[in-house]
Structures are given as C-alpha cells and as structure tokens.
C-alpha cells in the first residue's frame, strides 16, 4: 500500500523513508489533489455563513495527503534527486500548477475568504488565527484572485510555463553543483 495515504505511524510522525518508493509519489499527488478538491468543494457548497473555522481552518486542513507527499518529494528533489525524480517533477509541475491556480483563482472560495477577512476585527481571533487569516487572504490576492477573467487566463498560462521552467532551472543548478570538482595541486 502507499505510505502517503495515511499518517506515518512512527514516533513524532517521522516519514518511513524505507517504505517510500518512487512509484508511490505520483498516485499520492493525484489522490492528494482529488482529496483537496473534494474538501474545497465542501467549503464552497457549505450553506453556512463563512466563518474562520468553516472556511479558513477548513482550507488550511484540506490537503493532508498532498501536504505529506509534497513535503517529502520536494525535499528529496532538492537534496538528493535522481533522474527518475527529476522526470517525475517535470511531469507533475504543470499538474500542480493548474491545481494551485484552480484554488487561488476560485471566485466562490475567495468570496468566502474575503467575507471572513472583512470581519476580522470583530472575530476575537488569537494572534495565530489572525496570522493564518492574513496569510490566506494575501496569498489569494497575490495569486490573482482579484484579476478579471481574461487576466486570470493569462496568469494560468504564465504559471504553467513557470512551473516547468522553475523545475528545469533548479535541476540544472543541482546538477552543476553535483558535478563540481575542486582540484588542488601541491
């Protein structure tokens, strides 16, 4: 079974690297995207008035599988990549970029976030909750939630291209660092 589909049953939730194989990553990303989409759909379709709990916290907790697999995968590709991991990262980059755009450019979801944000001064939030609300709201705004439809379509194109270029650049830097040799003559 795929170790990413459940929480790691180790002390402190440390990943079980001995159980993680290359073939586990892609299905975990795809299932994580599906899980987050379902959770976001539940947030959007909620008939309840948007609150910090049913919108901001729900969004923050919407992707346990995706968070788990992303944390490990991207650390592995940054620190100890292989040709197979590199190929997979290039394959997944546009998929993940599209998924992120589908969230950050979702007008119904942003409206709920904005509704909570506009009443932030009257919510009696803790400092941590205020930080999460500010971070969530600003992330959506900075990711294009306030752009018109035409601008959002262009942003999606740019993000898709950037995702692949960013991975390629990172891999080139890593390959050059790994190939570096220092010769010292006596």
Predicted regions and their residues:
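Zn2+-dependent metallopeptidase catalytic domains
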Residues: 1-186
